[in-house]
């Protein structure tokens, strides 16, 4: 996500969206703010045309580069495939046993917390650059990106974002 826009562009986009810079990378929140600001800046509604154009340019560039970063698209999926990989209970889908899963991921645990952390460890050895949030959706990248401690509250914020993220983007 840090390679999508340069620093000045990302700061400008966050200012135009009216969001704190710490929210950079929270794509569902950014999308919601973008739609709200489109109504506010729209020239037909008496808004600032220049701000609207600049916001559109930056947002579309960010959106396109995020899509490219998440290529290749592996096609469609159906719910029976997902259910086979993960437990049906939504409480254990993201984290089966707190704090056990938060301390050490288990290859035998089907929760997303463990699976994404194990995926992070595997991918880390295949890349020269370090993995960062949006490149990797594990809770470690999340806490590092947003500067948070690993707590149950942080887990809840992570679960909320993961829950709104398309499954194929998780790269599981």
From Swiss-Prot:
Entry's localization field: Host cytoplasm; Host nucleus
Zinc finger H1C3-type: from-to: 120-141
Keyword GTP-binding in annotation: no
Zinc finger (C4-type): 101-114
Highest taxon above the source species: Viruses
Function in brief: Promotes efficient viral genome replication by accelerating both G1 and S phase progression of the cell cycle. Inhibits host PP2A by binding to the A subunit, thereby displacing lower affinity regulatory B subunit. Inactivation of PP2A in turn results in the transactivation of cyclin A and cyclin D1 promoters. Late during the infection cycle, ST may induce dephosphorylation of host MTOR, leading to the inhibition of cap-dependent translation. May establish and maintain high levels of viral genomes during persistent infection in cell culture.
Domain notes: The common region of ST and LT proteins comprises the J domain. This domain is essential for multiple viral activities, including virion assembly, viral DNA replication, transformation and transcriptional activation. This domain is also required for cyclin A-transactivating activity of ST.
Name this polypeptide is given: Small t antigen
Organism expressing this protein natively: BK polyomavirus (strain AS) (BKPyV)
């Amino acid at each position: 996500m840090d390679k999508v826009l340069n620093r000045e562009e990302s700061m400008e986009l966050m200012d135009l969206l009216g969001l704190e810079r710490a929210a950079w990378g929270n794509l569902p929140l950014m999308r919601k703010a973008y739609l709200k600001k489109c109504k506010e800046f729209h020239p037909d509604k008496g808004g600032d045309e220049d701000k609207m154009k600049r916001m559109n340019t930056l947002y579309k560039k960010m959106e396109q580069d995020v899509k490219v970063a998440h290529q290749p698209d592996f096609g469609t999926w159906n719910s029976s495939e997902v259910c086979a990989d993960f437990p049906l209970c939504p409480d254990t889908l993201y984290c089966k046993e707190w704090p056990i899963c938060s301390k050490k991921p288990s290859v035998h645990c089907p929760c997303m917390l463990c699976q994404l952390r194990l995926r992070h460890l595997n991918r880390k050895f295949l890349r020269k650059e370090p993995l960062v949030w949006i490149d990797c959706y594990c809770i470690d990248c999340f806490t590092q990106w947003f500067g948070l401690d690993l707590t149950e509250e942080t887990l809840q914020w992570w679960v909320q974002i993961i829950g709104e993220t398309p499954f194929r983007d998780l790269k599981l």
